[in-house]
């Protein structure tokens, strides 16, 4: 089944009892039992809910996995995955990882004894050097947030397998429409479903899919024990969003290519970060590893003052956290998504005060280009 078809017909669809074409929203907390201690598949909605189950079945198919679970946010999903590990365990992570991931690893999970090392995962040498006897996982974003570096997932899967550790991939930026990490050897794939999967800036959620049922059972135990589950209303919204994911990603990808080409040739832009550019060091890998380049673009215009002037001139782009929506969003990583990372560390990574991140939407590309052009001309 082709991806666009699977997004509509995959998983659990409709309701056999009523003939409803859409999955119902089961706004319920508990379920009648025929006898004490016996249930018919559901007992309490923290453990399972029919609407959430339908979403989980869908995303499991989309990621070609064996088990899937829906969480109350992307960070709840990431934290639950990290709770698979014990005090004294070590995780190797992408260096310019999302600020929330950096924060939970260095400010929360470290207090539980889970150690972390951040390296450039696009470098085989750095990853292999970072692995210790107590390393349990390699955690990757590809493309990374916000510098859009590309990591070779097949290579990382080989390194992880030889080291006897898990490979965890945050697939938020590319989505299963463009990239399927489990088919390339990953053990766990996760999403901030708030972003492209939802796609409309109206739901917060996280999704995790595992390559094995056994790993899925371990994760479900953590989820049920800690309680960070997604509610039925939000589960339904995500299923609705996923139906148009293919259409949206194609439109976003085409818009991003045009905008990146414009920015790459604009004198006000000092550095462009976009894997679709032939000048990007990961361009060839991005072409073979995924079916598209996605809708994220970062570029540096030199200073905080120039950034503020540029943002003040924009008319269509909304200054906001998050990404992956139908509307184009723009942010300043140093002051927004990555503000939790110490300034010295940000500068080491290249996350400067002049760096801007765009999440391209599905508006007409000509309107977006005109808006960016006039905003740059007047700084």
Curated annotation (Swiss-Prot):
Function per UniProt: Catalyzes the conversion of cystathionine to cysteine, and homocysteine to sulfide.
Organism whose genome encodes this protein: Bacillus subtilis (strain 168)
PROSITE patterns recorded: CYS_MET_METAB_PP
Class of the enzyme per the UniProt entry, highest EC level: lyase
GO CC term (a single one): cytoplasm
One Pfam assignment: Cys_Met_Meta_PP
GO molecular function: cystathionine gamma-lyase activity; cystathionine gamma-synthase activity; homocysteine desulfhydrase activity; pyridoxal phosphate binding
Entries under InterPro entries matching the protein: Cys/Met-Metab_PyrdxlP-dep_enz, Cys_met_metab_PP, PyrdxlP-dep_Trfase, PyrdxlP-dep_Trfase_major, PyrdxlP-dep_Trfase_small
Phenotype of null mutants: No visible phenotype.
Keywords: Lyase, Pyridoxal phosphate
Inducing factors: By methionine. Repressed by sulfate and cysteine.
E.C. no: 4.4.1.1, 4.4.1.2
N6-(pyridoxal phosphate)lysine modified-residue sites: 195
Biological process terms in GO annotation: cysteine biosynthetic process via cystathionine; homocysteine catabolic process; positive regulation of cell population proliferation; transsulfuration
Protein name, UniProt field: Cystathionine gamma-lyase
Catalyzed reaction equations: L,L-cystathionine + H2O = 2-oxobutanoate + L-cysteine + NH4(+); L-homocysteine + H2O = 2-oxobutanoate + hydrogen sulfide + NH4(+) + H(+)
CDD domains per UniProt: CGS_like
Family: Belongs to the trans-sulfuration enzymes family.
């Amino acid at each position: 089944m082709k991806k666009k078809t699977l997004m509509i017909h995959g998983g659990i669809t409709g309701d056999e009892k009523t003939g409803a074409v859409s999955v119902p929203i089961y706004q319920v907390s508990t379920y009648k039992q025929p006898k004490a201690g016996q249930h018919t598949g559901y007992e309490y909605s923290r453990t399972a809910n029919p609407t959430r189950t339908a979403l989980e079945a869908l995303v499991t198919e989309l990621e070609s996995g064996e088990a899937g679970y829906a969480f109350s946010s992307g960070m709840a999903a990431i934290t639950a995955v990290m709770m698979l590990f014990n005090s004294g365990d070590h995780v190797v992570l992408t260096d310019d990882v999302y600020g929330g991931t950096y924060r939970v690893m260095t400010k929360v999970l470290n207090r539980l004894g889970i150690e972390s090392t951040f390296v450039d995962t696009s470098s085989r040498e750095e990853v292999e050097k970072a692995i210790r006897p107590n390393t349990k996982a390699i955690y990757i974003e590809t493309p990374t947030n916000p510098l859009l570096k590309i990591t070779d997932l097949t290579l990382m899967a080989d390194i992880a397998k030889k080291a006897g550790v898990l490979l965890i991939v945050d697939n938020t930026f590319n989505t299963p429409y463009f990239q399927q990490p489990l088919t390339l050897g990953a053990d766990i794939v996760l999403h901030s479903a708030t972003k492209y999967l939802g796609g409309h800036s109206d739901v917060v959620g996280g999704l995790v899919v595992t390559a094995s049922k056994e790993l899925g059972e371990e994760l479900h135990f953590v989820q049920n024990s800690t309680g960070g589950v997604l509610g039925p209303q939000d589960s339904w919204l995500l299923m609705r969003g996923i139906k148009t994911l293919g259409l949206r990603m194609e439109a976003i990808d085409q818009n991003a290519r045009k905008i990146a080409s414009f920015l790459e040739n604009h004198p006000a832009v000092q550095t462009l970060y976009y894997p679709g550019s032939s000048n990007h060091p990961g361009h060839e890998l991005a072409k073979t590893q995924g079916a598209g380049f996605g809708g994220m673009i970062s570029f540096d215009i030199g200073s905080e003052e120039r950034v503020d002037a540029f943002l003040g001139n924009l008319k269509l782009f909304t200054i906001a956290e998050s990404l992956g929506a139908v509307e184009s969003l723009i942010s300043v990583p140093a002051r927004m998504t990555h503000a939790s990372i110490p300034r010295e560390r940000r500068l080491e990574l290249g996350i400067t005060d002049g760096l801007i991140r765009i999440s391209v939407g599905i508006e007409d590309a000509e309107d977006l280009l005109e808006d960016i052009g006039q905003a740059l001309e007047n700084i």
